[in-house]
From Swiss-Prot:
It comes from Mus musculus. Component of the mitochondrial ribosome large subunit (39S) which comprises a 16S rRNA and about 50 distinct proteins. Belongs to the bacterial ribosomal protein bL19 family. The keyword Ribosomal protein applies. It is found in: Mitochondrion. Keywords: Mitochondrion, Phosphoprotein, Ribonucleoprotein, Ribosomal protein, Transit peptide. One of its GO terms (cellular component) is mitochondrial large ribosomal subunit. This is Large ribosomal subunit protein bL19m. One of its GO terms (biological process) is mitochondrial translation.
């Protein structure tokens, strides 16, 4: 009995001694394992010049692929394109040279029917020898040096329209206050619309717009005054998209207007005027004029 107790005491002492000797080794192994898992530079702040330090990734560069490059979105003013069936091309070539020379003196900006413009002209009877008019462009017509554009505004409840000659030497400045398009290429129906659609503040400030940005299209549809109108705008030959006909006409009147419809005209290829080759030749003339 005594021998067995002595043997058990001896075994327990040997086990305690072995655990005491292995404890430092376990601590060192645990510290090495933590150092390997976390890494020596996990929580250390390294300077920018220290090799192997943490470097933040570069900021992403967002490129809007929907934007059209400025070189591709070139604008050719419509008066440069000669009319169909021209008989004297030399006349239009001489006119274009004169037009380009005048544009070097007076820069004519890009604008469309529906854009809001401010035009400054020389007026010998005004106090400051100049006069200004702001309005919405409702029409562009003419070719060559005879090109014109019409502005409309409502002043003191009265609709006022002024037709300017685009290359008139009395024009001192053409400022685009708001560049935009409308659903139609002709806004003469604003004469028969409510005055609120033709009223603009004469002190309106220009709306900034990037050069590479596409021209916005204003899809506004106007409300008309009660009939009679200056023209039968509901007939299909005008192809008006910017009028709320449902508020001004009845179903019987709309059906009556559709009797004048000629659906075969849109398929008549002889009515199309392909100006692609003419525009390419015109751009060569314009680029040559800029270099000279």
């Amino acid at each position: 009995m005594a021998a067995s107790m002595a043997e058990s005491c001896r075994a327990s002492l040997y086990l305690a001694r072995s655990v005491r000797m292995a404890r430092p080794r376990l601590a060192a192994f645990a510290s090495d394992a933590c150092r390997v898992c976390t890494g020596p530079s996990r929580f250390q702040s390294t300077g920018p010049s220290e090799p192997g330090g943490f470097k933040p990734p570069p900021k992403p560069v967002i490129v809007d692929r929907r934007r059209v490059p400025e070189d591709e979105r070139r604008f050719l003013s419509p008066e440069f394109i000669p009319p169909r069936g021209r008989t004297n091309p030399l006349k239009f070539k001489i006119e274009r040279k004169d037009m380009l020379d005048r544009r070097k003196v007076l820069p004519i900006p890009e604008f469309y029917v529906g854009s809001i413009l401010r035009v400054t002209t020389a007026d010998p009877y005004a106090s400051g020898k100049t006069s200004q008019f702001l309005g919405i462009c409702i029409k562009r017509s003419g070719n060559g040096l005879g090109a014109t554009f019409t502005l409309r505004n409502t002043i003191e409840g009265q609709g006022v329209e002024i037709c300017f000659e685009l290359y008139n030497p009395r024009i001192q400045e053409i400022q685009v206050v708001k560049l935009e398009k409308r659903l139609d290429d002709n806004l003469l129906y604003l004469r028969d619309a409510l005055p609120e659609y033709s009223t603009f503040d004469v002190n309106m400030k220009p709306v900034p717009q990037e050069a590479c940005q596409e021209v916005p299209v204003n899809k506004l549809k106007v409300k008309m005054k009660p009939k009679p109108w200056s023209k039968r705008w509901e007939r299909p030959n005008f192809n008006i998209k910017g009028i709320r006909f449902d508020l001004a006409l009845t179903e019987e009147q709309m059906k009556e207007a559709q009797k004048w419809n000629k659906p075969w005209i849109e398929f008549d290829m002889m009515r199309e005027y392909d100006t692609s080759k003419i525009e390419a030749a015109l751009w060569e003339e314009i680029e040559a004029s800029k270099k000279s």
